[in-house]
């Protein structure tokens, strides 16, 4: 049973549940509503509450906590960091990411940026090839950048940029970003027509767009 962190009594007529940025369950209830009813309502919403708390737990991880906790993000999953002596570059196998041992933080950061950049480019080029052909669009160039605010962009000259951290995201979320930027080659705005184009390629794009927000914290990972 999930217990609320706080029950706030107000003059409202309905009962509401809110999950704070810290993952706390806050209940707002009418003044005369019984605690028995409140706990019954919480029980009915328990699955929703736990899912929300899990999402917040993930998004609250900052750079130091994630990259110093023996875990790295790759394709939406957490991989265990294993340090290996005499290893020169980063390697991935199974559910592990192997990194060189006995190197300082700055050197490891540079290796991670290089590794994520390379693997992101591989993923992006493959998905661009598929979706550009499907959508019958052409782009002039592709660049992998280190933006701390954008996952991708498309210029008026059909130049595409994608964030090196894209390979941290789930595959379907990556696809959404690729489709989003390619759609700008047909509609250079965020109009209804623009989103109609996206929907024609990815009918459930709203689900993946919403999930992307859960990974906004990843934009701040790596320096």
Language model regions located:
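Walker B beta-strand of ABC/ABC-like P-loop ATPase nucleotide-binding domains
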Residues: 178
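Active-site-proximal or metal-binding-adjacent scaffold patches in catalytic folds
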Residues: 1-175, 185-223
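Walker B catalytic acidic pair
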Residues: 181
């Amino acid at each position: 049973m999930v217990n609320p962190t706080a029950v706030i009594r107000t003059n409202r007529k309905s009962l509401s549940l809110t999950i704070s940025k810290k993952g706390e369950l806050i209940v707002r209830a009418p003044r005369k509503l019984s605690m028995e009813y409140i706990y019954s309502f919480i029980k009915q919403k328990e699955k929703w509450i736990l899912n929300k708390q899990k999402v917040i737990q993930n998004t609250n991880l900052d750079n130091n906590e994630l990259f110093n906790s023996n875990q790295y993000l790759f394709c939406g999953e957490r991989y265990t960091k294993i340090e290996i002596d005499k290893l020169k570059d980063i390697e991935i196998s199974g559910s592990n990411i192997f990194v060189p041992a006995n190197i300082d933080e700055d050197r490891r950061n540079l290796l991670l940026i290089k590794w994520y950049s390379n693997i992101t480019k591989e993923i992006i080029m493959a998905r661009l090839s598929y979706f550009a052909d499907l959508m019958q669009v052409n782009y002039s160039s592709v660049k992998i950048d280190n933006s701390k605010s954008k996952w991708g962009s498309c210029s008026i000259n059909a130049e595409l940029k994608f964030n090196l951290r894209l390979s941290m995201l789930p595959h379907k979320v990556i696809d959404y970003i690729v489709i989003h930027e390619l759609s700008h080659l047909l509609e250079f705005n965020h109009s209804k027509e623009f989103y109609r184009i996206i929907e024609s390629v990815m009918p459930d794009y709203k689900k993946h767009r919403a999930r992307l927000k859960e990974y906004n914290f990843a934009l701040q990972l790596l320096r």
